[in-house]
């Protein structure tokens, strides 16, 4: 309960002060400026998914499998929607608060709850297949390979569940710092490994069948005198491209690791709690300060930096066509050129804000607003 209070307070502090622990008088979010519009988004459909992210700092992300997009709201509504027409295929009200999701694949739709439950629904019908109590909040999407479901809890446990029954197969535990951000990155399954970023600033790989450690690598080293200064959570999730794993921590570093060994390929100073994207041979980072930066994926040199969205609480970036896309606290999605970071487009989606990464599938982009609005776009 102590950690819950600290984490909730820290999340609130980050929202209020624009993720800076040192400023005495904080500046307001940067005002949006005019630019020459080069890319225009075309809205294809819009649907309401319950209360969206709810009142807590949830990061409920939609997921696509085939022709269907799945989304969940904080109040417990889960929906399956035909991703090109917007037709609702099914909806399920779980009658309990959802805090992590959505994971999808191998016939399962997976969410986690504030009460520490993992719930598996049938992908085709929405019928509940099983529920498993894991005794800690689940704040990110579970992952599955069809045999094992891997869950990361708020107290940085990785838990392997049987995909058919929900029975626990293994548990991997780590030491949690005194103070952490509210949230965890979603675990990632790659071959025989389950990968996760931890609140300690480490990335770990464990055997997906047994939960035994394969390797661990520290990405960020806690520094500073106060517990707040020493927060180095990896909350933005991991990005796997070929054999390279990209990761970024809060108040730490962006880094590239060899996924097979955990060997550090490169690193550079960065601070982000939302993660990275890849495109054009580059890595894109939404910094905690509100700047968006393009890095060379081979050596981490900075290619460009756009700081015009300072203190606007940006979402994780996504790559859509030749553009980098981020959402912000006022519900805008901003499109930046991958080449030089200049603004090329802007669209307001949800006046309650856009906190989660836009989801891109081919020529379609799906944006889930904090208020529950799920909107599908193409480029005009």
Swiss-Prot record:
It is a lipid-anchor. Belongs to the BamB family. A lipid is attached at residue 19 (N-palmitoyl cysteine). It comes from Pseudomonas aeruginosa (strain ATCC 15692 / DSM 22644 / CIP 104116 / JCM 14847 / LMG 12228 / 1C / PRS 101 / PAO1). Its main location: membrane. It is found in: Cell outer membrane. GO terms for cellular component: cell outer membrane. The keyword Transmembrane does not apply. Part of the outer membrane protein assembly complex, which is involved in assembly and insertion of beta-barrel proteins into the outer membrane. The keyword Chloroplast does not apply. InterPro entries: BamB, PQQ_b-propeller_rpt, PQQ_rpt_dom, Quinoprotein_ADH-like_sf, WD40/YVTN_repeat-like_dom_sf. A lipid is attached at residue 19 (S-diacylglycerol cysteine). GO terms for biological process: Gram-negative-bacterium-type cell outer membrane assembly; protein insertion into membrane. Part of the Bam complex. This is Outer membrane protein assembly factor BamB. Residues 1-18 form the signal peptide.
